[in-house]
């Protein structure tokens, strides 16, 4: 369908095959409908809380490289518009992965997936169970619409240029481009990545009030109606920001934001 870290993604058919050392591009199946189908079983087991690893649009199987915080990945949710082509054999250029682009940028797919997730959470709540989401806010992914290193969003209606694509991107300050001048664009890949990984651009909160505001909006959005999840598990919470002082201040703001929207919400930092 598309490529990830210089190789094509693939579906695993033989579950007896040992996982690869770099298994991030192999997919084993499963979606939110599958969770719904197993709710009777989970309830019979006495499960009280369902904690999901990241569910937002992301290209890897682990999904700790968020592509779009606003939407549940249609591969997990609902794909109504499935136009376009998969990558041809030997082609690793995701500008040609038009089926993947359609699946994850088409508004009908994205809205339908969010709607399905809201219905799933309501059903889980009806059964007396709770839902925790995984929040990955220290870094995003290079596929993220704010960065758009794969040029998936470039030129598409409803999307602004990513910071990799244009020096004039509204998301430029979301990332640290190491003092780069405008002559290094378009397509500037010289940015700070978490632990040096260019697939995991570190978010530069101290230099972007807009970024902080957006992430706090996301924190509020998913614990509010119509989704009403019951809390956040926070990935690498201690790494967020570039100083202990900012880190502490941000998480206090995060807690205040979440608790104002949902006073009973759980916040659990890694």
Residue ranges and their predicted role:
Residues 241-249:
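Short glycine/threonine-rich loop-to-helix capping motif typified by GTGT followed
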């Amino acid at each position: 369908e598309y490529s990830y870290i210089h190789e094509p993604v693939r579906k695993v058919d033989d579950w007896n095959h040992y996982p690869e050392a770099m298994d991030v591009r192999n997919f084993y199946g499963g979606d939110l409908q599958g969770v719904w189908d197993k709710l009777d079983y989970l309830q019979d087991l006495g499960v009280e809380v369902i904690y999901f690893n990241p569910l937002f649009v992301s290209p890897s199987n682990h999904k700790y490289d968020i592509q779009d915080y606003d939407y549940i990945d249609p591969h997990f949710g609902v794909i109504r518009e499935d136009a376009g082509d998969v990558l041809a054999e030997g082609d690793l250029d995701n500008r040609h992965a038009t089926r993947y682009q359609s699946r994850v940028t088409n508004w009908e797919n994205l809205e339908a997936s969010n709607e399905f997730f809201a219905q799933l959470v309501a059903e889980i709540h009806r059964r007396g169970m709770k839902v925790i989401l995984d929040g990955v806010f220290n870094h995003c992914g290079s596929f993220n619409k704010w960065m758009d290193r794969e040029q998936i969003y470039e030129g598409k209606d409803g999307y602004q240029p990513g910071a990799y694509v244009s020096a004039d991107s509204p998301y430029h300050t979301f990332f640290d481009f190491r003092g780069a001048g405008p002559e290094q664009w378009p397509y500037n890949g010289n940015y700070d990545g978490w632990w040096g990984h260019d697939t995991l651009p570190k978010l530069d909160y101290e230099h972007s009030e807009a970024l902080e505001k957006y992430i706090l909006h996301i924190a509020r959005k998913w614990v509010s109606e119509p989704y009403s999840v019951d809390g956040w598990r926070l990935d690498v919470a201690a790494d967020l920001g570039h100083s202990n002082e900012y880190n502490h201040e941000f998480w206090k703001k995060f807690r205040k934001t979440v608790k104002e929207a949902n006073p009973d919400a759980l916040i659990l930092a890694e």
